[in-house]
Amino acid sequence: METKLMKGKMLFAFLQYYKPYKKTAAFIVVGSFAVAFLDLIFPVFVRHILNVELPQQNLQSILLYALFLLMLYILNTVLLYWISYSGHVMSINIERDMRRDLFRHIESMSFKFFDNNRTGQLLARLTGDLTEIGELTFRGPNDVIICLVVMLGTISIMFWMNIYLGVLIALLLILKTVHTVIINHKMKAAFRKNRAKNGEVSAKAEEALSGIRLVKAFAAEELECSLLMKKNEESMAVRKASFKILGYFSSSVNFFTNFTNLFVLVAGGLLIAANKIQLSDFIAFLLYVNLFMKPLLRLTVFTEMYQRGMAGFARFYEIMQIKPEIIDAKDAIECKNINGSICFKNVTFSYGNNKVLNNVSFNISAGETVAFVGETGVGKTTLANLLLRFYEPDSGDILIDGINIKKYDQRSLRKNIGLVQQEVFLFSDSVRHNITYGLSEVRDEKMVFAARAASADEFIEKLPQKYDTEIGERGIKLSGGQRQRLAIARVILKNPGIVVLDEATSALDNKTEEKIQKALDKLTRERTTLIIAHRLSTIKKANRIFVLNNGRISEEGTHEELLKLKGLYYRQYKTTLDKNKLLDT
């Protein structure tokens, strides 16, 4: 019962995508009925000519009927053209709408969703799955209507022409229908597995190509190729199984077609010998049998398309049914003109069963610069992720300017927080696009000002097309320091009330860090700043330092105050100094 209800909901969701194109869909439906009706007319005219016009040798009437049939064929051709054209346009529009909805839905998910779903799998659902669905949205109503009308029409006419042959054909059709239902069930399961395996292949390929520099650095090309081929072999095994079912189905339809023709020929011959049917009726009957077989063969192709398309839609629907973990409140307010005070109240957070933060509380005044230090994995970056509402805490509250961040709408909240990370993500586009990303109608003066403030203009001016220079995938044409300065320029232009620096200089050499540090000083001036770092030069400038340990804040104070405590911070500081001395040596 639950499965039937789910199928009903899925079908309803599928049909909703026809709403914006109901005029086109109506034209396809009416046009398909007309095409099917025109297909049914030809044998009727043949029977009439054989029964009436030929015995009377009325050549003029025969020519008139031929001319009339020619006009009908031309009309049929024109109808088929417009049905095909408008139907395919409708299908790509529906495919676009589904892709837009799926992409927006995926974008609305919290980071937890992306932690549990591979990018390649999601890409497969956005591309291959939806392409299969798009074709089905047109071929579905078109093929089904034409095939059903022609098949039901031919069966009805065959019953009218000769009840004996009609009953025999109907019995054969019932047997074939039962056989088709059984095969369809197997095909559906096979194509569902096929789409899943294709997604795994896409995920593996995407992972290997994204990390191609690491792959080459470790000379692991053969390893990655073998892993991809393993996934490919698994996909091929599933596809081979589906091809067996499809091959069996196609060949069985072909056998049924030939057997039916043979059966009608033998049965018709016996009926003619027994004077139960006229020769002209028998010829018309044979024409209708062949006309009946055309949609049957067409349905064979459609069945494969239907199973592929619905398997793709099932995967689409599966994602669309996942509710975003973090949603805006109905009465959410816009976050704007913030002062920048931050308060964490008894915040607890876990990644699955791994508790990272345990009842953490602290206050940060507006305009204050605070650093968070601690061993790797103690939850420093998690604090930033929670502040930006990338994740929802298990318990506790986070406030900005005394208002719980759950009361702000997410877009405006994030627009007021600037994030600079160690791993800078840049788009495969121009310098201009990457600096102005997320902002609309930015004047060139403002963009250049932000670049200068981030000390980025000195290298941008040397680029071939300056701000319009393409920087390659993830900014590969730029150095690490240059990418970092673009990221800082992006945040300066954003002009947020709160800035989060997440290991922003940890991967840079000392000379580059000096340039970046100057840019960061301009960025953080008179803004609330959260620093997550190991570099002493960055930490020392903080008004306060929080030391995280075992999911809690174990120490708090200025750099000098924490050194006097001779606790965890002091030991980490000494260790860092010893390492630096060793490196200098």
Language model: regions and residue ranges:
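Membrane-integrated ABC transporters
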Residues: 1-39, 54-65, 83-91, 98, ...
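Transmembrane helices of ABC transporter permease
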Residues: 20, 24-34, 68-72, 139-192, ...
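Transmembrane helix-loop-helix hairpins at lipid-water interfaces of multipass membrane proteins
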Residues: 25-82, 86, 159-164, 273-279
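Hydrophobic alpha-helical segments in the permease module
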Residues: 69-76, 80, 173-175, 246-260, ...
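Loop segments that connect adjacent transmembrane helices in multi-pass transporters
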Residues: 117-120, 193-241, 331-333
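Cytosolic ends of transmembrane helices, especially the final helix of ABC transmembrane type-1 domains
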Residues: 197, 217-220, 244, 291-319
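ABC-type nucleotide-binding domain
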Residues: 335-585
